[in-house]
């Protein structure tokens, strides 16, 4: 029964971690509205609203490429595609709608009142001739996750990236079958209508989509060297992979639910001098060393000694954590 209880708690924790990722909306794109060509400021990226005179700036990107070629710039510096973004909506209003539908206690979730910022609901990537690229349509995970809660009228929903990928694929397939091109800002409405139909959204107000400004669409030029997608998460893939496979892994369950156990004795090894001395005793050191002209640092050596010693170590080592460049791979080689 205890194992079942821990497994259930573990699943809740994974769902919470996923929601943390989903509830981090991508930054609203910063556009380069003018770009320097010599001493001139040339119109470049563009917003679109009901009063706009700007068209989709594909010609501007091509013209600037020609200018760069004349300056003998490398191909990597040339613009070869653009992202068109739909909407400029208030995060606060959207999350408030979710809280209302889920009947959340607003005193308990008072931080919702402090929310600010804006988000877009999807992007569509096109080449400089208006043809939709392989990247195509990408629905915002933040928009999708909050919408799922609004539709379910509850926060206990299992949101999977696979569902978002499937939605993107279905929308892209419809666009492909109908040979849809994005030659003007208003063509994005075709994409929006397909997505709203798929998600069964009858109106923006129904789901709490309220404009943060009069901007309806935005277009940002991309160079060959630029990141393809705006919707990236470093952790989501890993969390979902672990969530699918954790049930038969006792160490993983124990690690994930460790904070639920009471009366834990934690040792902060970097400040506990007695513990440092204990693990730096002569008999704790390995008999050999990985060939290298470098020696491990103090904390690396302590970690190595702990890892190779079965004495006075009650728990199995589960993971090696740390920011990039802190010596994790070196540490594992030494162990």
Locate the predicted segments by residue.
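Short interface patches used for recognition in eukaryotic signaling and trafficking proteins
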Residues: 286-291
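N-terminal pre-P-loop "Q-motif" helix
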Residues: 292-312, 316
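Walker A (P-loop) phosphate-binding loop of P-loop NTPases
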Residues: 325
